[in-house]
């Protein structure tokens, strides 16, 4: 029996399953090249966040987790559940590929950008985050980077949790994972989150609609998974999750219906996966199919989401993946096929008729070590039903010139396909071409006197950016962006203290006008201090968010406005009352700084949370 249970665990930690690992140098990651490898062999800059990290930071949202990571800048139109944007290394929010268990998140069909404020943190057991182009591995969207959210649990057990906080915040949840018999594992989880929120419109600098009320958020989440080991080599699994979100925001009146105030968003999302894995000492393969369906309503709550004045963004997404990897020499070769179909239902507000977009991608990856030199490459061809074939490639080389020190050079191409709204919406243009990018990067990394560090410089040229033509009243390819940046990270211990440092310099500009791209801070400093003192686990976070620019849409013509820099401190502490019960407390924005990440939208100010978890 012990042998069988160990076998099930080993089969679960495959190149494609995403079972959580420790975040140290021996951590195994799967996102960089779609096969399992130690994180210290990945040539692209990579960050791993575990569930233990999330609990230590006491984050309440996925956005709160991501903002701590290198190369990340975020903007949000208020508090929990409000519209958010994720910028990686200065690229657009639509230039980051969001995966859930290796499958593209079905949330960006019409709008083109995934809003991580709507994804439940309760589902997140691990995040693997890759910076730089990855279209040669994954296809569209992976211009700035890839974020892979992994939902599978690391170990068996049952956890019950509850929390309260500022703005009437409440959270209640539970999960259990059990091994049945010798070779079957079952996981069930549920979560409920609610906050009354605060008025998201900032005072004194927004000419829009004044709506002095609280803008709250509520989420309900369910998750289930079943995994079975048929033999030493074959494993099958099925999993599903769904969530319902309701968000109140400061809305708008429509000129055609001046008595209707649209200020509520209701999102329903469900996803189902099923797969079969094969593993032996040299060869690994997985066949995975997935179906997801999302309905995103915006409406006047007095009239309901089915009223004619409501809007609906409804997308169905179908995915089939066949991924393979074989160990060769001192490395690995991977190859596979992706097929995806996105469908809009007739009646979707932004796309009146029903449309389908199909994409088939074939890719090849390779990683090989030759003495002190490591080479990595990937090539991919996508066949899209709208714009035809598109090819991408990338290559990297690392030279360990002194033991423990290496230089890495990389180049890659990437692209972003036009979304359904840009193609078929009210102002759509079905002749749009994909947005394209070329990125160069050079980096040094090493271990010096106990300090694990990395310094890199990069340039990203993005062409064919899609913009809106006011004269023609349609989308067209016109824009160009030139992004240059420097990124530095370091981690080290001093006695009982663990330090993590990050510095980002990003110069992201419109190549035609030389204007800075909005909502990107030119400089950021991030610092994390963790320690244990008398059984209390302490976590101190510092974040300097530099000056940014945004657009004031309340003026005509619109004007650029400057958002000042800010220094933010968070402090969190936890205490294990028993071996099963842990209590936690956190103060976010310790010094109650007043700042904005999106012009005209307030942030929460100082917030308190108190929570506890019981594990058995």
Curated annotation (Swiss-Prot):
Instruction: Provide one Gene Ontology biological process annotation.
Output: monoatomic ion transport
Location, primary (coarse class): membrane
Q: Which domain of life is it from?
A: Bacteria
Tell me a Gene Ontology molecular-function term this record carries.
Answer: metal ion binding
Q: Mention any one GO cellular component term assigned to this protein in its UniProt record.
A: cell outer membrane
- Stretches that traverse the bilayer: 158-165, 169-178, 184-195, 217-227, 232-248, 265-279, 281-298, 311-327, 330-339, 355-371, 373-383, 387-402, 405-419, 436-445, 451-460, 475-492, 496-511, 519-531, 537-552, 560-574, 587-598, 604-616
- The residues that hold cyanocob(III)alamin are 83, 85, 92, 110-111, 311, 519
Query: Where's the TBDR plug domain?
Result: 38-152
| Short sequence motif named TonB C-terminal box, residue ranges | 599-616
Q: Where is this motif: TonB box?
A: 26-33
Q: Which residues form the TBDR beta-barrel domain?
A: 155-616
Stored InterPro entries: B12_transptr_BtuB, Plug_dom, Plug_dom_sf, TonB-dep_rcpt-like, TonB-dep_rcpt_b-brl, TonB_box_CS, TonB_rcpt_b-brl_sf, TonB_rcpt_CS
Matching entries from Gene3D superfamilies are given as: TonB-dependent receptor, beta-barrel domain (2.40.170.20), TonB-dependent receptor, plug domain (2.170.130.10)
Indicate the secretion signal residues. Answer: 1-20
Binding positions for Ca(2+) 2 per the UniProt entry: 213, 215, 249-250, 263
Query: Where found, per UniProt?
Result: Cell outer membrane
**Assigned protein family:** Belongs to the TonB-dependent receptor family. BtuB (TC 1.B.14.3.1) subfamily.
Q: What function does this protein fulfil?
A: Involved in the active translocation of vitamin B12 (cyanocobalamin) across the outer membrane to the periplasmic space. It derives its energy for transport by interacting with the trans-periplasmic membrane protein TonB.
Protein name, per record: Vitamin B12 transporter BtuB
Q: Which organism is it from?
A: Cronobacter sakazakii (strain ATCC BAA-894)
